[in-house]
A protein has these predicted regions:
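A generic structural micro-feature
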Residues: 26-28, 75, 88-90, 115-119, ...
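Short beta-edge strand/loop motif at the mouth of beta-sheet-based domains
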Residues: 53-95, 104
Length: 178
């Protein structure tokens, strides 16, 4: 019996070590990106993203906690606009600040998560005219510390976050094309 327990312990230790070593092979940075063509001009779409107060109309994260606390600060929109949120476990808590606003082509946002996991990333929106439409790209990128790499062994971040971006872009499309 003792020999069987020892064998199981060794197998578990090797398995855990294997997962940890595999996590170390993951990239040191990540990037998730989705794009969608919206049949609206960039100057009509841009304000819906540059003003955080409009995010309640299209962001997939806003509906996950109707009681979420929101604090808007800085400028009303564009560079310097800030947004802090504190909600349930589905949305966590964090802070965003628009660092770069190139009307109507690009927004770069500093994105700091406090809960459920601490993280410091960058979100970026680009708006590229294409005939009578605008290609909107929503991206998030940043460092991948060891805990993120370990999570990536079990969870595909691109799939998980990418689905949210797809839902958000589809909602933004409905709003912009009204």
């Amino acid at each position: 019996m003792l020999k069987a327990v020892a064998i199981i312990a060794v197998v578990l230790a090797i398995g855990i070590a294997g997962v940890l070593v595999f996590a170390l092979t993951k990239p040191d940075t990540f990037r998730v990106e989705r794009s969608l063509a919206l049949k609206a001009p960039a100057d009509a779409i841009y304000p819906l993203v540059a003003d955080f107060r409009f995010w309640t109309s299209w962001s997939p994260y806003e509906n996950r906690d109707p009681a979420m606390k929101r604090i808007y600060g800085g400028t009303a929109s564009g560079r310097g606009a800030t947004y802090a949120w504190d909600g349930n476990n589905n949305v966590g808590a964090g802070h965003m600040e628009i660092l770069e606003a190139s009307t109507p082509s690009k927004l770069r946002i500093k994105l700091d998560f406090a809960r459920p996991f601490e993280g410091h990333n960058t979100a970026e929106f680009t708006f590229v005219p294409q005939g009578d439409a605008t290609l909107v790209t929503w991206a998030m990128y940043g460092p991948a510390p060891f805990m993120s790499k370990l999570m990536q062994v079990f969870i595909n971040m691109d799939t998980m976050i990418g689905k949210d971006f797809e839902v958000g872009l589809a909602s933004l499309k409905k709003l912009a094309e009204k």
